[in-house]
A protein has these predicted regions:
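S-adenosyl-L-methionine-dependent methyltransferase catalytic module, highlighting the catalytic core
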Residues: 10, 14, 60-61, 82-93, ...
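Conserved SAM-binding loop
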Residues: 3-113, 199-201
Length: 209
């Protein structure tokens, strides 16, 4: 990533320090929950980062219509939005020519569980269903799966354990064991199997916008 970056649904801003590269000039975090937006602002004030970190309390509609970004991120956010097609279309209007729109979302509708519903998920995605949301003026650059080990853990939880939500021990196991294993499995499977699906679109032109 480089230049100006927008993250929609930034939560508490935990992604920013890990994803931002030296090429990033400024990072805008959009978060509709005002309490969380305040936490991001507090975090931004504490950290010494080599770029400007801005916070917008609201949705993408709160942005200046003229604002343009070279990268727009939706990390585990799109599944929370009822009208996801309209959301991505509005996001694409804020892309610079040649800019990238990146979506990471939970995969496989058959894994949809009471836990998904309890945290406000409307759906999970397949490659096809995510690609079908390609916004006007954008072309699909890539679409792939992530977290192969997590897929099998989620399947076991759904079919065997039938747990409504993950326990603290399961989350710790996921972070410490499954994530490193997935880094290996994802490469071995050619990024064709995973708990999450990622799509990247590129803005082809600003003509007609």
């Amino acid at each position: 990533m480089r230049g100006q970056v927008l993250e929609v649904g930034a939560g508490i801003g935990s992604n920013t320090p890990y994803l931002a590269t030296r090429a990033v000039r400024d990072w805008t975090s959009v978060e509709p929950d005002r309490a969380l937006a305040r936490r991001i602002a507090e975090c931004a004030a504490r950290r010494e980062l080599p770029f400007i970190w801005k916070v917008v309390a609201g949705t993408i509609d709160a942005l200046d219509p003229a604002a343009r970004f070279q990268t727009i991120l939706y990390i585990d956010v799109l599944e929370h939005i009822a009208d996801h097609r309209s959301e991505l279309s509005r996001a694409a209007l804020h892309l610079s020519a040649g800019g990238n729109l990146v979506v990471l979302a939970p995969a496989h509708q058959f894994l949809f569980s009471p836990f998904d519903a309890s945290i406000g998920h409307y759906r999970r995605y397949s490659r096809a269903s995510l690609i079908a949301l390609t916004p006007p003026g954008c072309r699909l650059s890539s679409c792939f799966m992530l977290d192969a080990a997590g897929f099998f853990a989620s399947l076991a939880n759904r079919v065997l354990l039938r747990a409504s939500r993950p326990r603290a021990g399961q989350i710790a196991f996921w972070d410490k064991v499954l994530v490193p294993v997935s880094c290996i499995l994802d490469r071995l499977t050619g990024y064709n199997l995973g708990k999450s699906v990622v799509a990247v679109w590129t803005r082809s032109s600003r003509t007609g916008v």
